[in-house]
Amino acid sequence: MIYLHNIKLTAMSKILVLGAGIAGHTASAYLRKWLPGEHEVIVVSPNSYYQWIPSNIWVGVGRMTIDQVRFKLAPLYKKWGIVYKQARAVSVHPEGDSEIQSGYVTIEYTSDEQKGQIEKVPFDFLVNAIGPKLNFEATEGLGPGKNTVSVCTYSHAAEAWEKLQQCFSKMQKGEKQKFLIGTGHPTATCQGAAFEYILNVDYEIRKRKLENLAEITWISNEYELGDFGMGGAFIKKGGYVTSTKVFTESFFVQRGIRWIKQAGVIKVEPGV
């Protein structure tokens, strides 16, 4: 038997990883690398692709394509000796039942070949790495297909790029455009991605020499700029220490970006 961070693995253990994003993919890769071959590593994910989420920002401004930020999971996991099931987890049963003595997860396949099929996947150890749920429904009018765009997934980011190009076309014809970028709910905590995106949008506008036709505004539930969901931080460079509040404000002032802070979005209306 071996121990993995104080967890005892007996012969032929089944380690089930839920999720194949940054956390799940990393966990399964290291588990397969570290564990002897008799132990089985299983990954369950509803998606057929792995995507590098931070690069969605560049998809959203046309600097990368969808296929540059994703790859198929099945071929890689087959090469690595990882059992891959394209399915969504429906329920977790840590105590098992009358049929399965160990814990198991009920899954529903999402692949074209097995779509809708239900299976019970036993496990000896479970890694929960499913990530966050995109809760656009929490704010009326928020989300793709409604009154905003998003860069939360590669498909969302591709749509954002399409909409951004439409704005560029209007600006090139002399029509002013307003851009409102930030967090979409009073309790949102991922301001960093929106901050990256607003600066990239500003860069693309300036690259096209259209900045005089653009009004860019940052909206966030942060108490102060630069909180980034963690109460701010400090940056040391060139012998100076600067707070992220000053850092962020300086970036925005330099680029003429307006800001609205301590604001929780509760509704997004069309054409506003």
Predicted feature residues:
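A conserved beta-strand/loop element that lines the FAD pocket in flavoprotein oxidoreductases
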Residues: G81-S91, V253-E269
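Beta1-alpha1 glycine-rich phosphate/pyrophosphate-binding loop at the start
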Residues: S13-Q86, H185-T242
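FAD-binding core/adjacent interface of flavoenzyme oxidoreductases
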Residues: I2, I7, K85-E196, N200-K209
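Short gly/ser/thr-rich secondary-structure transition/capping motifs
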Residues: H25, E108-E113, V268-G271
